[in-house]
Structures are given as structure tokens and as C-alpha cells.
């Protein structure tokens, strides 16, 4: 990408739900504002996401500012849907690795592209997240890091005006089968 387009990233606001690794990648890429909505860190989360300290397991994930120039705002995942919608409003893209169904519905309501924990983008006026059979994805540190990296690349491409991978097309990362492009099926179709 051209330097102008990369510098322009500081003008964007992205919501990240439940993935500290995505937060780190986007912050280091120069995104201007990141609203990080955290959740409870399980033992599995701390094993899969290498940006989490295993001692942080069984706690809520709170992050602070990353630098004087960055605008990282941390929230706990709210119990109230109205509050979640308020936090998400005004963002340019929403990425969720937890609470995906609820977050996808709000993203559609507020007219923002939604990216789940696989490599694809759901546009507000396109295929709906909840209408597709969601693939079973094996989670381990390597496949998770590759998935997050590919998602960050897709976000940069989208913000630079290039076409991302749009649902129902998706990329899945599996250590046994490699990186593969798939077409997600609508629920109820064979």
C-alpha cells in the first residue's frame, strides 16, 4: 500500500470484541481509535492468544493506552444491548472473536461491516452472519495468529478502498489442511 493510504489509517475507528491479538495488530498498524470490548479470559483463551499472559486467565481483560498517540478505549462487555450498541456506534468496522451473534446483529443495525473469528467480511446489506452454517474451526496458537494476521490484512485492504473477502466466501486456517478458501452454506441447504 502507498504511504498516504497507510497514514490515512489514523482517521479510522474499529471495534474489537474479545481478541487482544487483533487489538495489538490494529494498534501497531496505525488505526486511530480502537474500542476494545473485553470479556472474561478463560484458560483456553490464554493458551491460544500469545498476547495474553497465562496468569491473566480467569479475570476480565482490561487494556490501557498503548502510547501517547494511540486512542485505545477499553470496555467490559456490557450486559445491556443498548450499551453495546452505543459503544459500537460511529465505528468503521467491527471485529468480534466472542459474542459474535449479538455483535453481528448490532453491526448490521448500525450499518457497519462485521468480521467474525474467520477471514471474511459481512456487509450490512449483504449475507447475514446468522444465516450461514458456521464452520468448525480448530483453535490453537498458530492457526489463531495466522487468522488474526489475515484479518488485519483484510481490514487494511478494506480501509484502503480495496475489496475484501466478502461472505459467503471465507478463508479458514487449519494446521492439518492448511489455508483454504471456502464458500459458507446457508442454513438449511445441502
Task: Please give the residue ranges for each predicted region.
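Adenine nucleotide-associated cytosolic modules
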Residues: 1-190
Amino acid at each position: 500500500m502507498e504511504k498516504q493510504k497507510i497514514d490515512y489509517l489514523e482517521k479510522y475507528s474499529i471495534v474489537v470484541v474479545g481478541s487482544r491479538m487483533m487489538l495489538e495488530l490494529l494498534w501497531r498498524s496505525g488505526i486511530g481509535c480502537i474500542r476494545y470490548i473485553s470479556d472474561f479470559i478463560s484458560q483456553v483463551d490464554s493458551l491460544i492468544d500469545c498476547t495474553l499472559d497465562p496468569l491473566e486467565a480467569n479475570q476480565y481483560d482490561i487494556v490501557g493506552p498503548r502510547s501517547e498517540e494511540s486512542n485505545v478505549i477499553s470496555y467490559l462487555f456490557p450486559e445491556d444491548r443498548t450499551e453495546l450498541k452505543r459503544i459500537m456506534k460511529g465505528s468503521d468496522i467491527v471485529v468480534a472473536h466472542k459474542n459474535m451473534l449479538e455483535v453481528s446483529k448490532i453491526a448490521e443495525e448500525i450499518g457497519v461491516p462485521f468480521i467474525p473469528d474467520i477471514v471474511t467480511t459481512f456487509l450490512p446489506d449483504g449475507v447475514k452472519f446468522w444465516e450461514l452454517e458456521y464452520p468448525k474451526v480448530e483453535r490453537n496458537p498458530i492457526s489463531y495468529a495466522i487468522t488474526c494476521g489475515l484479518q488485519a490484512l483484510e481490514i487494511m485492504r478494506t480501509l484502503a478502498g480495496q475489496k475484501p473477502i466478502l461472505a459467503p466466501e471465507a478463508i479458514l486456517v487449519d494446521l492439518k489442511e492448511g489455508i483454504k478458501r471456502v464458500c459458507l452454506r446457508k442454513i438449511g441447504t445441502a
